[in-house]
Amino acid sequence: MSIHIKQSTMVRPAEETPNKSLWLSKIDMILRTPYSHTGAVLIYKQPDNNEDNIQPSSSMYFDANILIEALSKALVPYYPMAGRLKINGDRYEIDCNGEGALFVEAESSHVLEDFGDFRPNDELHRVMVPTCDYSKGISSFPLLMVQLTRFRCGGVSIGFAQHHHVCDRMSHFEFNNSWARIAKGLLPALEPVHDRYLHLCPRNPPQIKYTHSQFEPFVPSLPKELLDGKTSKSQTLFKLSREQINTLKQKLDWSNTTTRLSTYEVVAGHVWRSVSKARGLSDHEEIKLIMPVDGRSRINNPSLPKGYCGNVVFLAVCTATVGDLACNPLTDTAGKVQEALKGLDDDYLRSAIDHTESKPDLPVPYMGSPEKTLYPNVLVNSWGRIPYQAMDFGWGNPTFFGISNIFYDGQCFLIPSQNGDGSMTLAINLFSSHLSLFKKHFYDF
């Protein structure tokens, strides 16, 4: 698909901002490699009659000038996003130098319908999400990049490339909400808090009370012959209606559990089982379920301030053999998920912070496999609490929100319906040879 870049603007904060270095916690640094951004897209389909949605000060649907001006104002309280990474000794910092965020305005001769259901893929990412050149060094590229793309049908997309060292998805969408509110002439809903050292520094002396295997590489050695013919990967979407979710939950044996299981716990357990069955591994092989968890509500001694802007993502991990996942009921599997999530309390997370800081060479947790490596584990990332409906810049709510590209086999995202009908969509990357079996098991209930 063709795309034409009309202009690229480095948007600086509208006012003078603090010129300082911002300390990053190990939690900030280990979720992604420093030479990478995370992509997401918002889709807005222009209404047939949009008189009530158009900004009164603009005759253009999604006026770039309004968005750029609002972005410049939003970068004042969120000034680290206008900075650059730098290295200080053995760790990264954010140089809050106000160099700016990249805003790209583009247009395409295609229509939004050409992208079908907006499943994540390389082409969607290429067309809708901005990129940068990493070859010039760690301080050369912006930490936030945004692209407004107009399509022939009148609809638009806003693609984000966000650097994970700056903040996690929740903080990023709080920033987007502030940007959207400013574009409508409103004040930001939250005042961001950027001091990571004050709130997430390690204790002295460290108090490591648990074994934190979730911060170690997750790739075990598997027989090479299992890889034969499995070099092509596919990204796709699988939808679960409210009725299907209720049917799945009705299959649970509630007599064997003393607590109620949440929808996420049930669906995540179901995905874990379905992927395990689809891969055709031996019964004795272990398969882990890895779940990124927002620690904001779990850290309470002391609690994080409202508006904390940084990474508060920790990993909950369940382990089972392929045979156990196939034979045991879903109630047991979902119970394992619940148990792993409950274990991430304040005491455990503070211990995890101390553990990460005590390991100077701690690697990025391996959340999937590179090309030509068979990876037995599954990562299920929930986007259920992301306020995507707050992304109204003055022209109405998005009609779609999702990840733009999933790079690793076994990585998936659970995204709730945008229309509030109780359904959810699973975006997943698997080897192409596993997809048909996964679909069979995923809908077999």
Curated annotation (Swiss-Prot):
Family of this protein: Belongs to the plant acyltransferase family.
InterPro entries: CAT-like_dom_sf, Plant_Fungal_Acyltransferase
Keyword Lyase: no
EC primary class: transferase
Pathway per the UniProt entry: Phytoalexin biosynthesis; methoxydianthramide B biosynthesis
Keywords of the record: Acyltransferase, Flavonoid biosynthesis, Transferase
Domain of life: Eukaryota
Catalytic activity: anthranilate + benzoyl-CoA = N-benzoylanthranilate + CoA
Enzyme Commission designation: 2.3.1.144
Modifications after synthesis and translation: N-terminus is blocked.
GO biological process, one term: flavonoid biosynthetic process
Induction: By fungal elicitors. Elicitation triggers a rapid, transient induction, reaching maximal abundances within about 0.5 hours and returning to basal levels within 4 hours.
Gene behind this protein: HCBT3
GO MF terms, alphabetically ordered: anthranilate N-benzoyltransferase activity
Active site residues per record: 164, 392
Alphabetical list of PANTHER family matching this protein: SHIKIMATE O-HYDROXYCINNAMOYLTRANSFERASE (PTHR31642:SF11), TRICHOTHECENE 3-O-ACETYLTRANSFERASE (PTHR31642)
Keyword Zinc included in the entry's annotation: no
Organism: Dianthus caryophyllus (Carnation)
Function: Catalyzes the formation of N-benzoylanthranilate, in the course of methoxydianthramide B, a phytoalexin. Phytoalexins are produced in response to infection by parasites, and are essential for the expression of disease resistance.
Protein name: Anthranilate N-benzoyltransferase protein 3
